[in-house]
Amino acid sequence: KNLNLKKFYRAKFIEQQQRHLKYHESSYALEPNIKEAPGGLRDLNILIWVLRAAHLGNTWQEVFKKGLITRRECELLESVTKSLYRLRIHMHLLTNRHEDRLIFEIQEPLAKALGIVGTVGRRPSEVMMQHFYVNAKTIGQLNSIILQAIKERYSKEPEQTGEPICSGFVRQGDVLGLESPDVFVKNPERILEAFLIQERHPDIPMKSSRLYRALFEAHSLMNKEWAENPVNRQTFLKIIQGRRGVWHALEEMNRWGVLGKLLPSFNRIVGQMQHDLFHAYTVDQHTLLAIRYLRNFTHSENAHELPLCTDCLLYTSPSP
């Protein structure tokens, strides 16, 4: 039976979006569901199902040979897949039941069963959870790259060269793209500009696979010199001084590892979980959520909720 790839892709894409919303678009919870939450096994399943439907392979190696992913992406996908299945099997053995939630009570014994040792000031369970969050982030990044690449390859819409929107960037409908794959390599200052552009243009919410992949490969470009570059610091100030979309921009920067490269102190808390019941998310997620709530108080439509907070945040001292 012939499968309508476009309909199948759309159905799976919507299914994934709805599932992510159910888990509040986050895998960085105290007790993440390693199968259903964003960055979990189901996100890998979605990729394989769509790739198989597109006749692009049944394994990551086959997909690599078809040219849709790079060798590094293939190796990472194999690694995170193996890691998640190993974690899930040990969870089932430890609980003696079908359990896909990394519940608080089993995190410490699970870490010991996996042979994970703690470090100074960190329990084995905290080390294990940070490994999980890093893998979940990697899966989320690769999921975005591959799904967008499939959409672009098999879309029946006429190919768009893109309308120049800023030096190095083009607009393709509601998608932000790059003029060439090496835009960031030639000028690493463009990395932060990608987030500034989307903050200022909420009508361009999507990124092209070329832009996704360029961000994924940009880590080696974001060194100490890059972080201390006055141009990059100025661009970052423009982002956090924006009237709208600041939290979303910071969330995206964190998702692609840019925020931690720009702010080394922030990088140390990425994926860091405290082994107690008082913290529902990782430290980096708590920090970003705090910023989100503070930003909400600056919007007049939210002033009725906590008027004192709004007054304090919007207060400007009188001129002397």
Where do the model's predicted regions map?
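Non-catalytic interface/linker regions that flank or bridge core catalytic/transmembrane domains
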Residues: 1-279
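Conserved small/polar residues in nucleotide/adenosyl-binding loops
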Residues: 315-320
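Alpha-helical phosphate/pyrophosphate-handling elements in metalloenzyme active cores
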Residues: 50-63, 278-314
